């Protein structure tokens, strides 16, 4: 993410006549839509009616952390809950300078669908472009940029970690 952000900042600075631009990084803390995506580990972030199958319940029972297991089983991630999260995020973003930062880097975004929903909420403040970078996080959550500049290209620069401190990829 660090190299990615630096690349975007350098490219953006070439195309702006302003002396300054602002950057905000924000962990969206599990920004999920309400659709079940079989390619993502989104089982905690679904409407309660999608959590009633035996398959879902058994999958949740394999979760070791009690609070995560309870979210998987009982959290009702419905349209109202998702919209409240989007509204709260948009309000936090716009608080910066009353119009939001020029470049917004987000972590923990599920997919382009939910990113686009956030983008539409803050677009009236001058935002012009967005990109989602599909990573290798085991849960399937990704990083994203929303910017007041046009994005020319985006690319994941994967860094492989090896050795005794090797961990699985996360957001």
Language-model features and meaning:
Residues 4-16:
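Sec-dependent N-terminal signal peptides
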Residues 7-10, 34-38, 115, 152, ...:
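A generic structural micro-environment signature
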Residues 15-121, 132-138:
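N-terminal, active-site-proximal structural segment of metallo-dependent hydrolase catalytic domains
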Residues 109-171:
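Structured beta-strand-rich core segments of catalytic domains in phosphoester-bond hydrolases
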């Amino acid at each position: 993410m660090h190299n990615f952000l630096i690349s975007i900042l350098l490219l953006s600075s070439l195309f702006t006549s302003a002396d300054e631009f602002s950057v905000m990084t924000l962990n969206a803390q599990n920004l999920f839509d309400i659709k079940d995506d079989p390619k993502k580990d989104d089982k905690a972030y679904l409407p309660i009616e999608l959590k009633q199958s035996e398959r879902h319940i058994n999958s949740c029972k394999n979760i070791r952390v009690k609070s995560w297991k309870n979210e998987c089983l009982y959290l009702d991630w419905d349209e109202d809950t998702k919209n409240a999260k989007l509204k709260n995020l948009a309000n936090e973003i716009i608080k910066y300078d009353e119009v939001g930062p020029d470049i917004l880097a987000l972590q923990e975004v599920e997919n382009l669908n939910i990113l686009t929903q956030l983008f539409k909420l803050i677009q009236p403040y001058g935002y012009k472009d967005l990109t989602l970078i599909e990573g290798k996080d085991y849960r399937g959550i990704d990083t994203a940029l929303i910017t007041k500049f046009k994005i020319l290209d985006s690319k994941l620069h994967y860094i492989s970690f090896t050795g005794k401190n090797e961990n699985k990829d996360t957001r």
